[in-house]
Amino acid sequence: MLAEPVPDALEQEHPGAVKLEEDEVGEEDPRLAESRPRPEVAHQLFRCFQYQEDMGPRASLGRLRELCNHWLRPALHTKKQILELLVLEQFLSVLPPHVLSRLHGQPLRDGEEVVQLLEGVPRDISHMGPLDFSFSAGKNAPADIISEEQNSPSQVPSHSPQTELPSEEIPALHPLNELPPPQPAPIRPAEPEEWRLAPSSNWPMSPEPQEILQDPRESNPSQGPSWLEENSRDQELAAVLESLTFEDTSEKRAWPANPLGFGSRMPDNEELKVEEPKVTTWPVVIGAESQTEKPEVAGEPLTQTVGQETSSTGWGGTPADGSEVVKVRGASDAPEPQGEMQFICTYCGVNFPEMSHLQAHQLQSHPNLQPHPSSRSFRCLWCGKTFGRSSILKLHMRTHTDERPHACHLCNRRFRQSSHLTKHLLTHSSEPAFRCAECNQGFQRRSSLMQHLLAHAQGKNLTPNPEGKTKVPEMAAVLCSHCGQTFKRRSSLKRHLRNHAKDKDHLSSEDPGSLSSSQESNPYVCSDCGKAFRQSEQLMIHTRRVHTRERPFSCQVCGRCFTQNSQLISHQQIHTGEKPHACPQCSKRFVRRAGLARHLLTHGSLRPYHCAQCGKSFRQMRDLTRHVRCHTGEKPCRCNECGEGFTQNAHLARHQRIHTGEKPHACDICGHRFRNSSNLARHRRSHTGERPYSCPTCGRSFRRNAHLQRHLITHTGSKQEKEVPQECPECGKSFNRSCNLLRHLLVHTGARPYSCALCGRSFSRNSHLLRHLRTHARESLY
């Protein structure tokens, strides 16, 4: 079946077969023969072909047929049925898993039938006889495909009639998920060699013309047995391999060592069990080395135990991650020892002796590239991220569950990773862990030492402080391109850039053209309100806080619930009285670090946020945002009960207590309760007699700041300052307070906004209504 038949014998057996091929091939154009790739180059192109979505299945099949014709030359060496069979098996091996899954359970006979199935075209049952697919799965081969011994280089190969199967008698093709079990094949007597086993791979290769298979050592004795020699043919092959290695698609991790063994890429390959070791004959391969190198000489039989092969490389002899496996030959003619396998990364070309080393290299050097379909990956069920190791996935899951198993025994602070705890413990140690060899300055972290050594390397002046230690100069490593602010660390710059991104996202909501860029920067979108976030944790917190109102973290002391575990931890410091954050200038202590940061701004005069309308400056961006609402009149916070709007959410929460009647703040002396803490503070001054607001001119003190401001008007020197310009538009009467003017306007309008709920009588002032209600109270007593 695989040997080259003698034309006379073939004409006697099948008179029309050879004539059909001759009619189809015809006279070949010499220019086309020169332009087509050489057989070994076409072989590499055929094996390394990858399926592309833009080409489609029909164009991919046509390209494979063209490459296989250049490689196998079916008019000279093989039957058309064998050519179609090789094309079919390679076509199935390059199909992606989601396309290959559509062919499960379908009896495939040729490549055209596969294309019709993928394109949805009804199949023609009488198209052609089925082709044998038993040896193309990479696990077993027909019994007649064996290595044969070459008697003489000049001998014309003969063909045995028993080895050829007519096309109409070839057994039917089994479905992909019902591959037939391998059958042991007897070894036949040696015949003139035309197919043999290549020592460098398990790829089946077709026989080439005699001049191509000539031993390179015979033509040039100085050259070694390597197939990449310094000649024109090898230079052409090396150029093709280099382009395939570094200019291929980003989806390919490495070349498979045995593309025929596509069974390792099947989704249902777990069902293929090996019950007992069976001896099979592997597909033999035509190599590019000398024809005189026979497996029998090296003492290697052509049969191999299935159990041994699958335990090392998987089904079909393919590595687990599909990386390229080659055997490196030296310059000498000595036989290569077994086990010298090299795994090559097709992105950078680095060689590794073991597969685990290659996988670790790809995880570290190429982390952003998508893994090979057959490589192991661990996916997070929360956000969908994939990881190469289960330990990394376990650490990532703690960001969703907020689990912090590592606790500090000194301050009870908890961390997700043990490395973070180790860095934290250095802050409690008085002895520095790292010291500078030049100035003997100590540091708790290696990064601080490296920054200090960088200052030494740049030749900066390190002035000693009074304690004898050198002071590291301030180094601004990164600069914000938007506002010009500098940061020491790149992580701080990334957090700062999010503030600019928020402003861009707000502007992009008004510009529909920039919606796509906003979705790329914020991939996690809330299904309720459409708000987008950069991280899944932010989306989870937003859903709990705004939509579901879920508060899974509760305080065991007071029962108060929180949406985040960090809020619960900071709240528990209120019960313990712990205030770990102290101001270095006034020694005032705070429970939270954010409170200390806000307090530190009060000591400085820096107010970087300015109002564009009135020029007023603020220390924080949120204060400026609240102030701008005074100019625009925007009141985004509205009450669901009465519809009244407020500029701040805190004002809305305080207003809602009027509807609910909640008074959470109680006086510990008289028990009187108040809605706001400020009212409680003013009430306590009535018990203590405290008057914190004093006049700097006369020394008179007041309980409220408003009373002090009213009193200061009496000390102003000019009459214009005494008379506040609040005049009545009806009668021209002036008032020093706006509330008095509003009360006076009720006289002109006749409005009585305060009505009694019992008798319906209305009043212009609230004090009059309260006085009227007392009459009803007296009536109820009698």
UniProtKB/Swiss-Prot annotation:
Compositionally biased region (Low complexity): 510-521
Tissue: Embryonic stem (ES) cell-specific. Not expressed in adult, except in testis.
Residue span(s) of domain SCAN box: 1-71
A cellular-component GO term for this protein: nucleus
Zinc finger boundaries on the chain: C2H2-type: 292-315, 321-343, 349-371, 377-399, 421-443, 467-489, 495-517, 523-545, 551-573, 579-601, 607-629, 635-657, 669-691, 697-719
Region annotated Disordered, chain positions: 1-37, 197-233, 290-321, 491-522
Induction: Transcriptionally regulated by POU5F1/OCT4 and SOX2.
Skewed-composition ranges (Polar residues): 302-313
SMART domains: SCAN, ZnF_C2H2
Composition bias, Basic and acidic residues: 11-20, 28-37, 500-509
Modified residues (Phosphoserine): S160, S206
Disruption phenotype: Knockout results in high lethality in male and female mice, with most homozygous animals dying before weaning. Knockout 14.5 dpc embryos show facial asymmetry along with inner and outer ear malformations.
CDD domains reported for this sequence: SCAN
N5-methylglutamine, modified sites: Q485
Keywords in alphabetical order: Activator, DNA-binding, Metal-binding, Methylation, Nucleus, Phosphoprotein, Repeat, Repressor, Transcription, Transcription regulation, Zinc, Zinc-finger
Subcellular location, record wording: Nucleus
PROSITE patterns on file: SCAN_BOX, ZINC_FINGER_C2H2_1, ZINC_FINGER_C2H2_2
GO terms under biological process: negative regulation of DNA-templated transcription; stem cell differentiation
Keyword Transcription on entry: yes
Function recorded in the entry: Embryonic stem (ES) cell-specific transcription factor required to maintain ES cell pluripotency. Can both activate and /or repress expression of target genes, depending on the context. Specifically binds the 5'-[GA]CGCNNGCG[CT]-3' DNA consensus sequence. Regulates expression of POU5F1/OCT4, ZSCAN4 and ALYREF/THOC4.
Protein name: Zinc finger and SCAN domain-containing protein 10
Organism listed in the record: Mus musculus
Protein encoded by which gene: Zscan10
